[in-house]
Amino acid sequence: MESSEEDDEYPFIESITPQSKIDSVHQSLTEKGIRKLCCELMDLKDAVENMCGDMRTKYLAFLRISEEAVEMEHELVELRKHISSQGILVQDLMAGVCREMDDWNRLPGDVHDAEVEEDPLPNEVTDPKSEFLEKIDLLLAEHKVDEALEAMDAEERSSPDLKGSVEMSSYKSAFMERKAVLEDQLLRIAKQPSICVAELKHALIGLIRLGKGPSAHQLLLKFYATSLRRRIEAFLPSCLTCPNTFPATLSKLVFSNISVATKESAAMFGDDDNPAYSNKVVQWAEREVEYLVRLVKENASPSETASALRAASICLQDCLNYCKVLEPQGLFLSKLFLVLFRPYVEEVLELNFRRARRVIFDLNETDEGLESPSDFVTILSEFAIASDTMMTDCSIRFMQIVQDILEQLTHLVVLHFGESVLTRILQLYDKYIDFLIKALPGHSDEDGLPELQDNTVLARAETDSEQLALLGAAFTILDELLPRSLVKVWKLQIENGGGEGENSAALNSSAAPELKEWKRHMVQAFDKLRNYFCLQFVLSFIYSREGLTRLDALIYLTETPDDLHLPSLPFQALFSKLQQLAIIAGDVLLGKEKLQKILLARLTETVIIWLSNEQEFWSAFEDESNPLQPSGLQQLILDMNFTVEIARFAGYPFKVVQNHASVVINRAINIFSERGINPQSSLPKTEWFTEAAKSAINRLLMGSEDASEPEEYECEEEEEDDHHIVLPEMDDDSDSEDTSSLSTVDSFESFASASMADLESPSFTDSES
């Protein structure tokens, strides 16, 4: 009962196929498939072997038939010789038989008739023209072209029928036919692909003797063109293994072939006496140069790689040198080569500088081919301590990629494409400057700066040290590293910069005027970064975080003068911030005193320029509802003189600052005069403002209100240091700028290291305290 229930519960168990049976079935099917496949492969192998055997048999049969054909040709030649000799024997036999028969049949009474009767057969047999033609036929049949040519030349010189006959006689026609056969044989010899140079020259000389000079000249040029193609086809597979040097080998093959062909043409055809041949050689050489340029383009590395630039440079250098060597032979190919090759070089330069932009501005981009010169890394890494390392990497990449591009250039590339290279370096540096400006605080899309194509965003340089490090890196590239690299390429003399250390290199602009113009534009590009930094620094000083201005006209309308004659609080703050910045600059820009003075002088200048252009500031003075006091004008003039004295005291180029301050003072005097205040009667003398400004600087440095007015320094006029970089707006005054007697490094350091109670939150001296 239980078993029946189990059978009812599992009725399908008997229909299950065991796994072993499944495995055996699949195994048998797999074995059958493999056996079938092996059989098919064996059949295919047998078929291939049979086909190879048939091909081998047919090839051997073909070779045997070819040999038999050659032997048959020789037998035919021998048979033709034999027939010719037998023909001569038959003619001799016939002549002898005719004479004997004539003797036998001659009777005594028929003497007169025999003398009158003409026998045409002996004349026909002894005709020299027929003998000559038969001789030529025999020589042509035996392919003895030299003997045939000599015989035909001799006959043509001696036979009057060939030399002076105007009408075409039968003999002359037969002679010209055989001459055409000889020409055809010489052409076939010259057109053989495996012919050597000696055999070719021999055949061409024969054609020239036959009066076929143009055909011979064409065959000569065709031979050298064909041999060049074969040599290049054998060389091209190795281009991938030597991408930098293959253009040099190609140019050597092409131009050496042109030179040999030109010499052979002149020797065989006398190109100097026949301009038609020389013109043909020039046209042929131009086609070969076009072929060379096309080969270089087709087989070069990708145009954006440094190896492509190196290959193009070597090719241009070698080709122009070869063109110069060919000029004594009457071939002037330099201009043609430059016209053909210039677009390719420009393309390679453009794509390499595009690669440079990717490597510099896309910090995720890597270029394993770039080396890391220790001098670049060491010099620029000094700024990594004070700034973000990503920004320093950007500067290092800039110099690495530019140096890598410059190292690929040869002397003649610099000569013909130097201006283009300088322009692209300028554009790259300008992009680099825009890239750094994006890292400065205050940058926005409304600043009028061109957007970079990449989306890489640097971390903001928030602190003064980080911002100064950016400026220092950009200035070092401009003033030291780029000139040093260009000097090596342009092969100019290096001039030490005097106050900038032994490693400072300047370009000898008198030797390369384009470098002088390029340097001027590079300085202008750097000025964008410098001016943007100065503007943001001044704006952060003038405006509070709430957007309120600290430098307001109310300080000249409401505040009362004090007995200490100190500058207003905003200008005391300016003095403090400049002290603080000078200390930071002394650490970050160590050894870059030139840049420090440029920046700090520009900062003082920017403050006055902003004040001069701030219409809201001047509107407060022009508003008649605001009462004006002479003390306000006196305080404003004192602040301007104080700003000028800051620059003079620290040794900055202060002449431009003084000019801008004069503009502000004159404008203020005019406004106050229009409002009824007489400056002549209400203001002290000019010397008073100068002394008061000097005294204020001393008081602020000493940090004491009770300090007497010490005569710490007196101004002396001396020429500005000639070794300093003079900005474009300072060129007119560079030779006559006045600096303080403290315009030395010591005085600058004393200014930078002046004791401050708290540089972060300085305490200003208020006249009301």
From Swiss-Prot:
Keywords: Exocytosis, Transport
GO biological processes: acceptance of pollen; exocytosis
Domain of life: Eukaryota
One GO cellular component, as annotated: exocyst
InterPro entries recorded: Cullin_repeat-like_dom_sf, Exo84
UniProt family annotation: Belongs to the EXO84 family.
Acidic residues biased stretches: 706-721, 729-738
Covalent S-S links between cysteines: none
Ranges where the record places region Disordered: 705-747
Function: Component of the exocyst complex involved in the docking of exocytic vesicles with fusion sites on the plasma membrane during regulated or polarized secretion. Involved in polarized cell growth and organ morphogenesis. During cytokinesis, involved in cell plate initiation, cell plate maturation and formation of new primary cell wall.
Source organism of the structure: Arabidopsis thaliana
UniProt-recorded name of the protein: Exocyst complex component EXO84C
Gene that this sequence comes from: EXO84C
Complex and partners: The exocyst complex is composed of SEC3, SEC5, SEC6, SEC8, SEC10, EXO70A1 and EXO84.
SUPFAM superfamilies assigned: Cullin repeat-like
